[in-house]
Amino acid sequence: ELQEIGYRVESDFEPGSRNTAFETASRKFEFIPEESKDAAKNVMVKAEGEEPAYPLVLIPYDSPRLASGFIGDPPFMIKTVPDTVLKENDLLVEVHPKTAQSLGISEGKPAVLKTPKGEARVRVHLFEGIMPGLVAMPTGLGHQAYDGYLAGKGINFNDLIGPVEDEVSGLDAAWGIRAKLSRV
């Protein structure tokens, strides 16, 4: 097909030498160039927010039953989401029982989840599989559009988080944000 539609070749083009293709010390491709390794060793990307005001860290998690992108879930998929994730229109966040106990919060009870970017009313699901000090929120909920099966169900994780820049690469490293969980 390429022969039929044609292509262009510049007659004076000369490919570079393999020995000069990569301007690194090893002259090979390097995921992290030697010059950057020291800078990357001890850099931990901090979650946005100050610890005294926001003692917990909110992290997202994906569920195979929820689409986490811009597209909405089909209505039959919403019906398969367990009550430990979405109960009626209320989103449940996962909290370790020790963390919940220290906050005076129990299973299924309403709470306010606050971050430097916003706040939301949630319910609490106690889960020993999450590390104490973390709050996990499913992605893929909180749509404001589509239809009656999707709109208004849960909370959009993106409303509670913002970009965090990795100092070494300059890329967004928004893996979580500091948070506070309070009883209602």
Each model region followed by its residue ranges:
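Long, contiguous, secondary-structure-rich segments that constitute the structural scaffold
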Residues: 1-8, 68-184
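Long, low-complexity segments enriched in small/aliphatic residues
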Residues: 1-83
